[in-house]
């Protein structure tokens, strides 16, 4: 029975969302299949999955809770793949099915946007939020219940942004107050924050759709009571949790994961390192990273200390992934903008709290100046 429709067939969702769905089904806490469609015209992955009976493998490689993980997870939770362009009737039928309850999407950061020139009659050749508006109107007209939307696009307030776009299209297309009320009161739009390094497509036996990723995963979901009853992922011990707001977790991710990257990369490159793993395996440089992380960055974040410490430890563990050669020069791109967004906030917060400059973050800034 199809309970989930997913807009997005790329490596990230197949290594992230399907992993959660598969785990929930295997543990007996969920009984639902997913249908996948591509949000754009390119149907190469959809066709490749169809040739494999909609099955593929996730290759999990990395460190988790102190252990080296090198595992394969077979995925068979996909009921069908739908070509958005060539199989519009199938897409509409699935969207209007009685069993459907959850929509997952990843249409890139540019996917959730509004275009006043989009017209309903041009479906499916319209933007993703316009497609959803068109399909939701079909579902509303068929008398079906509202849906829960779980966008994982990496923009702030992704659920709210999707909802706002849909409401704009509803007004643009004169879909009526009853439909607008349906969207606002019968549907739930969740803000989310996701985190997993997906290294991409890999060769695995005869599987043309195999994808590789780290074992670590985090899925923070800002959901109302209706959505919490529908979403099964928090029942699986894989880093998914409901939260009153994703904003503190976004701040945590930016300051710790992204911030430590930026704090260490240029100083590390200046010290002669080439990849991230070598930095954290050098005792002297690791001490530098831990001092900046524990004594400066963590001191500026107002969250549960136990959770902060656990997350910080997982970040260092992820940096030491023996299967990923993460090049410092690749991470160094746009470092000035990255330092401003990821490290300057911690620098200023520390200064305002303690009345003095943080030594490690100051050294990181010196490394930035020296690099350029």
Residue ranges and their predicted role:
Residues 1-372:
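Substrate/ligand-engaging "lid" and interaction regions
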């Amino acid at each position: 029975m199809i309970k989930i429709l997913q807009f997005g067939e790329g490596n990230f969702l197949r290594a992230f969302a399907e992993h959660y769905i598969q785990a929930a089904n295997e543990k007996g806490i969920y009984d639902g299949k997913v249908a996948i469609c591509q949000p754009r015209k390119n149907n190469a992955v959809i066709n490749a999955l169809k040739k494999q009976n909609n099955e593929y493998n996730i290759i999990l490689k990395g460190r988790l809770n102190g252990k080296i993980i090198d595992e394969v997870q077979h995925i068979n939770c996909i009921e069908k793949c739908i070509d958005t362009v060539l199989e519009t009737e199938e897409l509409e039928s699935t969207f209007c099915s009685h069993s459907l309850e959850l929509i997952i999407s990843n249409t890139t950061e540019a996917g959730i946007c509004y275009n006043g020139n989009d017209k309903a009659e041009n479906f499916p050749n319209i933007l993703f939020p316009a497609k959803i508006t068109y399909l939701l109107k079909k579902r509303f007209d068929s008398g079906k219940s509202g849906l829960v939307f779980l966008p994982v696009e990496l923009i702030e307030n992704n659920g709210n942004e999707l909802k706002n776009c849909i409401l704009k299209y509803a007004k643009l297309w004169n879909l009526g107050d009853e439909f607008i009320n349906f969207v606002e009161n019968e549907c739930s739009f969740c803000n989310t924050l996701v985190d997993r390094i997906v290294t991409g497509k890999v060769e695995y036996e005869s599987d043309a759709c195999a994808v590789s990723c780290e074992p670590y995963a985090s899925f923070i979901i800002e959901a109302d009571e209706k959505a919490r009853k529908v979403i099964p992922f928090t029942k699986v011990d894989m880093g998914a949790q409901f939260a009153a707001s994703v904003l503190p977790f976004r701040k945590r991710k930016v300051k710790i994961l992204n911030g430590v990257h930026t704090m260490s990369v240029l100083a590390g490159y200046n010290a002669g390192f080439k990849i991230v793993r070598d930095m954290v395996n050098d005792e002297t440089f690791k001490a530098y990273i831990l001092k900046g992380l524990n004594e400066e960055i963590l001191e500026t974040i107002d969250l549960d200390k136990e959770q902060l410490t656990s997350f910080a430890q997982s970040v260092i563990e992820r940096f030491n992934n023996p299967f990923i050669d993460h090049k410092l020069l690749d991470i160094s791109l746009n470092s000035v903008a990255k330092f401003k967004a990821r490290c300057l906030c911690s620098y200023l917060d520390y200064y305002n709290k303690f009345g003095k400059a943080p030594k490690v973050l100051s050294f990181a800034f010196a490394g930035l100046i020296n690099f350029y």
